[in-house]
C-alpha cells in the first residue's frame, strides 16, 4: 500500500476546524498523564473532562463530543466504568478512541481491549508493539515501550483497521495513519519526546477530539500527529532537557493554533 504524506495545508485546515469546534473530550485516561493530557487539549483549543466514576461515565459519554479510553493504569472498577462509557458512546454515536497501553505485555488488559473492539472505536492509537499485539500478530513490547519499528506494524494496522472500521495510528519515529485502504506517514518530532511521560497518551486524546470534527477523519487524525511533532520540534529547540521541554511544548501547541487563526 502506498503511504502518502500530509500537506501543510491539510494540517492547517484541520487545526482551524479543531479550534472552531472546540471538542469536549471525555478522557478516561491513566493516572500518570491526566494533567499533561488536559493541558495539551486546552493548548489546542479543546475542552477536556476527566470523568472516571462508574455512576457518571455513561452519562457523560453521551454529552461529550468524543471519548478516550486509555488502559494505562487499568483496574477492575475502572474497566467497569470504561465499559459503561463505551456502551453509551456506541448508543449515542459518540466517536471513541482506544489507547491500548502495554496490551502486548499483560493478559488482563489484552482481553479487555479485545472486548472493547466489539463496540467499534473510531480510532486506535498505539506504538508498533501495541498495534501488532492488538491485531493478534505478535505479543511484544517491554511494558509501555515498543520493541518494533512503526513501519513493521503497517500491515497489522491495516488489518486492524479493516476488521474494526477504525482509523489506526501507529506512532514512532514516523507516525503512520491508516483506514485499511489509505495510509499517511507523518515525519518529524524529536527523540526527546520519548523522555517525557505522556506525549503518546496526550496524542491519543487529540486523536479522539479529531474524530469529532467534520470532514476527512483520516486527514484530521493524521493532522493531530503532525501538530504534536511540530510542537515537539519547536519545544526541543528551546529547552535544555525533559524538565523544560513540557512548558515549551504546551506553548508551541498554543502558538500553532494562533498561527492558523491569524
UniProtKB/Swiss-Prot annotation:
InterPro entries: Hyethyz_kinase, Ribokinase-like
Catalytic activity: 5-(2-hydroxyethyl)-4-methylthiazole + ATP = 4-methyl-5-(2-phosphooxyethyl)-thiazole + ADP + H(+)
Keywords assigned: ATP-binding, Kinase, Magnesium, Metal-binding, Nucleotide-binding, Thiamine biosynthesis, Transferase
Gene3D superfamilies named in the record: 3.40.1190.20
Top-level enzyme category: transferase
Protein function: Catalyzes the phosphorylation of the hydroxyl group of 4-methyl-5-beta-hydroxyethylthiazole (THZ).
Protein name in the entry: Hydroxyethylthiazole kinase
Lineage of the species this protein comes from: Bacteria, Pseudomonadati, Pseudomonadota, Gammaproteobacteria, Enterobacterales
Amino acid at each position: 500500500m502506498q503511504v502518502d504524506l500530509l500537506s501543510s495545508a491539510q494540517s492547517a485546515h484541520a487545526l482551524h476546524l479543531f479550534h472552531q469546534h472546540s471538542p469536549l473530550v471525555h478522557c478516561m485516561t491513566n493516572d500518570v498523564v491526566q494533567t499533561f493530557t488536559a493541558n495539551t487539549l486546552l493548548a489546542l483549543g479543546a475542552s477536556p473532562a476527566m470523568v472516571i466514576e462508574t455512576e457518571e461515565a455513561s452519562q457523560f459519554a453521551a454529552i461529550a463530543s468524543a471519548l478516550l479510553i486509555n488502559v494505562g493504569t487499568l483496574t477492575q472498577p475502572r474497566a467497569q466504568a470504561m465499559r459503561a462509557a463505551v456502551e453509551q458512546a456506541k448508543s449515542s454515536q459518540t466517536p471513541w478512541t482506544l489507547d491500548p497501553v502495554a496490551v502486548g505485555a499483560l493478559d488482563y488488559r489484552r482481553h479487555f481491549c479485545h472486548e472493547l473492539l466489539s463496540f467499534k472505536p473510531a480510532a486506535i492509537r498505539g506504538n508498533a508493539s501495541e498495534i501488532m499485539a492488538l491485531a493478534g500478530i505478535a505479543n511484544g513490547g517491554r511494558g509501555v515501550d515498543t520493541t518494533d519499528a512503526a513501519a513493521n506494524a503497517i500491515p497489522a494496522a491495516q488489518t486492524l483497521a479493516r476488521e474494526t472500521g477504525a482509523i489506526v495510528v501507529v506512532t514512532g519515529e514516523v507516525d503512520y495513519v491508516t483506514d485499511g485502504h489509505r495510509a499517511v506517514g507523518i515525519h518529524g518530532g524529536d527523540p526527546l519526546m520519548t523522555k517525557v511521560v505522556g506525549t503518546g497518551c496526550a496524542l491519543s486524546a487529540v486523536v479522539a477530539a479529531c474524530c469529532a470534527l467534520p470532514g476527512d477523519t483520516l486527514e484530521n487524525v493524521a493532522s493531530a500527529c503532525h501538530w504534536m511533532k511540530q510542537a515537539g520540534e519547536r519545544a526541543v529547540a528551546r529547552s535544555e532537557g525533559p524538565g523544560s521541554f513540557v512548558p515549551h511544548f504546551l506553548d508551541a501547541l498554543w502558538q500553532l493554533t494562533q498561527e492558523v487563526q491569524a
